[in-house]
Amino acid sequence: MTDATATVDRYLAALNEPDADTRRALIEQAWTPHGSLTDPPIEGAGHDGLATVGDVLHEHYAGHRFERTSAVDAHHGRYRFAWALVGPDGTTAVTGMDTGVLADDGRVGEVVTSCCRM
């Protein structure tokens, strides 16, 4: 298994990327072809579904970015970490925790998001 922190940072970079084509390429690097993200208001599976998640996030939270706010705790192919969705002015819009599964190739196989504060 590759370094879980680097993997998590790659998938956050993909979600933060404002350009849809670049975001799609980053998604393909960070997630397995059948990878999934399940969040209370939205979910997507496969590279197409994950690209749609990214599009929706950028539409609803223009100028915001995800920041990891904790270390990545990982073992046995699973991980978890805390995050914040930070607006252009530096204020935190939402906080949460992601848990998930890492594939053998080091990419993300699954992400499940829990929002903690909105």
Predicted region positions:
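Short acidic-aromatic low-complexity motifs
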Residues: 1-30
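Short aromatic/hydrophobic contact patches that present stacked aromatics
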Residues: 12, 36, 80-82
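A beta-strand edge to alpha-helix "cap/lid" segment located at domain peripheries
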Residues: 16, 57-118
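Alpha-helix boundary/capping and short turn/kink residues
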Residues: 17-21, 40, 90
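A solvent-exposed, acidic/Ser-Thr-rich amphipathic alpha-helical stretch
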Residues: 22-77
